[in-house]
């Protein structure tokens, strides 16, 4: 079976969904911009050699409808002979895009793929057109469709206090701000055109969503967002609403060698699991364990972890049950996470994988894991190995 390698990985800055930098930029343009960027950064690859494009997106309606992957590829002027498909596994969509492309390469159905994802939550809100089947109430709790309440459930089950959540949320903003100031994100962000507060067109090269003035005290003043009477989850300890895209160039190891392209990482193992929809945020735990089993590795072998921070109340139980609380500041979300950067649904899987690979390089880590929870009770994980 062919080994799958990551040749390059990029993302746009994360724009604030409400009146933010990308308020006049469409999802297809964010995606096409990254497709063009990957090709311009890797000139040894002829675009005609791309076998397929896999692009994650959750709300496939309006500008994100009618196969946004193909629309973006056409905008990017990728040859019409290159096919493209849009992938939806809710929050794990662009990581699923990576898995689908990797499997195609492993079995010889492809040699070169572009993968990525996009979500413009300002233009296409996550509740746009949602219409759950009423019969689901017979098989799952009604709250399973309300992500904030699933986080509240996990907090109660795992004794995660409001104070712990606020502390973790403040950490996310502080670390993301430090990563911005130190230039750590420069290796992954492709400057992207947007509009400033006055409507002037400019190129953004920083994440707009980070709040550097966030403190535990300022978070403590916020009211519960989902359970007003007994809740502990607030807007401040939840992932921000943001717009963005992410992308990777992946190929077989043999094709990368023949093109003379540097290899940044290999895919060691992949996994997707299901779990109780009422505690959907717990999915990273069984997904990570299964991926590590397939990789023949243990938790102790992993140098860096990236967990998507849907909620602090969701992330902390996962960190706790993976035995990582004592190593939090050495191994987990070292540049912050979705609480600070936002969680543009279809973008996030490739985004956290991109951040992970950059951290593995800067920290000289051999192995890393990127993992996410998924609405309605799933988890997804990928084990990466430095080349």
Curated annotation (Swiss-Prot):
Pathway linked to the protein: Lipid metabolism; fatty acid beta-oxidation
Enzyme Commission number: 2.3.1.16
Keyword entries, A-Z: Acyltransferase, Cytoplasm, Fatty acid metabolism, Lipid degradation, Lipid metabolism, Transferase
Catalytic residues (positions): 91, 343, 373
Listed InterPro entries: FadA (IPR012805), Thiolase (IPR002155), Thiolase-like (IPR016039), Thiolase-like_sf_Thiolase (IPR050215), Thiolase_acyl_enz_int_AS (IPR020615), Thiolase_AS (IPR020610), Thiolase_C (IPR020617), Thiolase_CS (IPR020613)
Coiled coil: none
Enzyme class: transferase
Pfam families from the UniProt entry: Thiolase_C, Thiolase_N
Gene Ontology biological process terms from the UniProt entry: fatty acid beta-oxidation; phenylacetate catabolic process
Compartment(s) where it occurs, according to its Swiss-Prot or TrEMBL record: Cytoplasm
Main location group: cytoplasm
GO molecular function, one term: acetyl-CoA C-acyltransferase activity
Domain of life: Bacteria
One GO CC term, this protein: cytoplasm
NCBIfam families in the record: AcCoA-C-Actrans, fadA, PRK08947.1
Subunit structure: Heterotetramer of two alpha chains (FadB) and two beta chains (FadA).
Family listed: Belongs to the thiolase-like superfamily. Thiolase family.
Function: Catalyzes the final step of fatty acid oxidation in which acetyl-CoA is released and the CoA ester of a fatty acid two carbons shorter is formed.
UniProt xrefs under HAMAP family: FadA
Protein name as annotated: 3-ketoacyl-CoA thiolase
Source species of the chain: Pectobacterium atrosepticum (strain SCRI 1043 / ATCC BAA-672)
